[in-house]
Structures are given as C-alpha cells and as structure tokens.
C-alpha cells in the first residue's frame, strides 16, 4: 500500500478573515431574520471607528518613514511615572470605547512608548469621558458618575504602575507580524527626516506601513464589531441580573467577570445598569459590572489578542478584572 504524502500547504491556516465571513453565514443559516440587524450594527460601529483607524495608521506610517519613532520612545525615558499619571488623566477625557482605543494603542506600542503609560491610557480611556459622565449622572445619579470617573483614573494609575513594575518581563510586547514584503527595508534612521516623501526608500516604508497596519486593524476590528453585534443580540441582560444581586466579594468579582461578555459602551451602559439595579443588582456589583464590561469586553479582547503577546494579554485581563472588582468593593463601602 502506497501512502500519498499530504502537503501542509493543501490546508491553509484559518485566519480572522475566515471568521469575519463565517459569522454572517452562520447567522444567515440559523437566524436569517437577524442578519440585517447584525450586519448593520457591525457596519455602523466600524464606520464610526474608521476615522480613528485612518489617523492611527497615518501616524504609524509617518513616524516610521520619518524616523521620529525613536525620538518619541526616548521622550519617555526617565519620565515614565509622570507619563503614567498624564495618560490616566487623559484617558478620562478621551471619548473612546474599548475597541476604538485599539488603533491608538497599536500606534503607541509601534513607536516604542513604554507599556506603563500605554496601559494607563488603555484601561482608563474606555471608562469615562465628559459626555458619558453626564449620561451616567442622568441615569444613575452623580454619586455613581463621580465614582466611575474616579475609578477610571485610579484603574489607569493602578494598571500603569503595575505594568511599569513588570516591564522587565515584556521587552517586546507586540506580536510579530508579517511586513509588507516589498524588500526595501526600513531606511537607516538618524535624525528624523520630516520631508520623507523626497526620499524613495522612505516613501516605500510609508506605503508599506500604511498598507500592513491598515489591513491589520481593519481585519481585527471588523471581527471585533461582528462579535459585539452577536453579544448585543443574543446575550440577554436579564439573564445576568439574577446572578449578581448581593454585596459580597464573590458577587462583586462575579459581576466583573460577567461584565466582560455583556459589551457595555459608555453611552448605552447607564440605562442597562439602571435596569439591572431595578432587578436587584447592588451598587457595588453594578460598578464592577460596568467597569469590567467597558474595559474587557469580548470584542476588545479579540482585538487585543491580535495585537500583543499572550503574556501582555493575560496581564491586561488580570488588571481589568482586579481593578473592576476593587472599584466595586470600594464604591460599595462608600455609598
């Protein structure tokens, strides 16, 4: 009997694009009436994020082509603690949800900004901004709104300084990615050359970085928003409320965990949490649930997983869960 060797290339490895195609096909097969709503939700969310993606990839490509990324990375040397504080405070003003912040995190990491300030902005930004502060106050009261704002900055500081302490473990946080393959290589960088378009090698780097990073972010954020659409449609809020009606440590921690699949952006969350509290959710559990959902939703986790190495991903989840639980417990004791 003759064995026929099977080439590995005959079975291409699944990619995120396969899942992007498979999700609408599965919805069309099992719930055809929902297909239009799922696609519309994902398209609207992605359309709202496209300006951020464009800004981020232009920034990355421009900095790479000019050689300025080294100067930006050097600007944080010896100033990391101050940068963490500023990043946590700025995160409270930036109107980004947990998915919209991903392009900017990719840009900061790509140009060598240390993980401490990046993590501070990463954790604080999805939690609060001035418009959502007003919306939260209207739905849940100023005590809850101020508590969430303070929690956002505190979580940013906690995550930033924790990551600074662990920075020796993460010398290369980004996952390796395929370059554009143009063969030109990056130009030798000394002083930044701001008029990069006058040099053929730097124009090539700009075009390559623009294409590679643009496709990368578009792919993973498309997947993230399709997952978000599924979460919103098929995960009932009422099913979660019955599990988190108490005030104890376990209940608050469970609320932080359950907040992850129940995607909560900073504008829709207050009305949902108000309804959950009317069904018996405690204030401490509600705070943990809201923070856990804003920082570590499944769509955001999918995008983060594609961006950083597994060790950084695990720390990101651990900081989000720990911070959400602590915020809930402290808020419960105060109110």
Predicted regions and their residues:
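Membrane-embedded alpha-helical segments and adjacent helix-loop junctions characteristic
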Residues: 31-106, 200-262, 270
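Intrinsically disordered, low-complexity non-transmembrane regions of multi-pass membrane transporters
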Residues: 1-17, 168-209
């Amino acid at each position: 009997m003759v064995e026929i060797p099977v080439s590995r290339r005959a079975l291409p490895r699944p990619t995120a694009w396969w899942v992007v195609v498979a999700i609408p096909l599965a919805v069309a097969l099992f719930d055809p009436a929902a297909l239009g709503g799922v696609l519309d939700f994902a398209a609207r969310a992605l359309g709202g994020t496209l300006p951020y993606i464009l800004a981020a990839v232009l920034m990355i490509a421009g900095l790479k082509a000019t050689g300025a990324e080294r100067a930006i990375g050097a600007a944080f040397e010896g100033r990391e603690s101050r940068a963490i504080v500023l990043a946590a405070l700025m995160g409270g003003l930036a109107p980004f949800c947990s998915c919209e912040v991903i392009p900017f995190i990719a840009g900061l990491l790509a140009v060598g900004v240390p993980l401490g300030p990046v993590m501070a902005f990463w954790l604080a930004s999805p939690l609060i901004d001035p418009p959502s502060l007003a919306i939260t106050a209207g739905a849940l009261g100023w005590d809850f709104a101020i508590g969430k704002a303070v929690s956002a900055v505190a979580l940013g500081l906690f995550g930033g300084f924790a990551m600074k302490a662990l920075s020796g473990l993460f010398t290369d946080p980004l996952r390796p990615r395929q370059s554009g393959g143009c063969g030109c290589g990056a130009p030798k960088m000394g002083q930044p050359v701001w008029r990069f378009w006058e040099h053929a090698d730097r124009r090539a780097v700009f075009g390559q970085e623009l294409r590679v990073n643009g496709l990368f972010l578009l792919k993973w954020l498309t997947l993230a928003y399709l997952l978000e659409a599924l979460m919103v449609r098929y995960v009932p809020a009422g099913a979660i409320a019955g599990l988190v009606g108490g005030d104890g440590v376990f209940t608050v921690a469970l609320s932080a965990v359950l907040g992850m699949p129940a995607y909560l952006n900073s504008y829709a969350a207050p009305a949902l949490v108000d309804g959950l509290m009317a069904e018996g959710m405690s204030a401490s559990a509600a705070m943990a649930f809201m923070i856990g959902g804003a920082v570590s939703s499944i769509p955001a986790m999918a995008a983060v997983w594609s961006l950083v190495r597994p060790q950084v991903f695990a720390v990101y989840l651990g900081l989000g869960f720990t911070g959400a639980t602590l915020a809930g417990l402290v808020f419960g004791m105060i109110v």
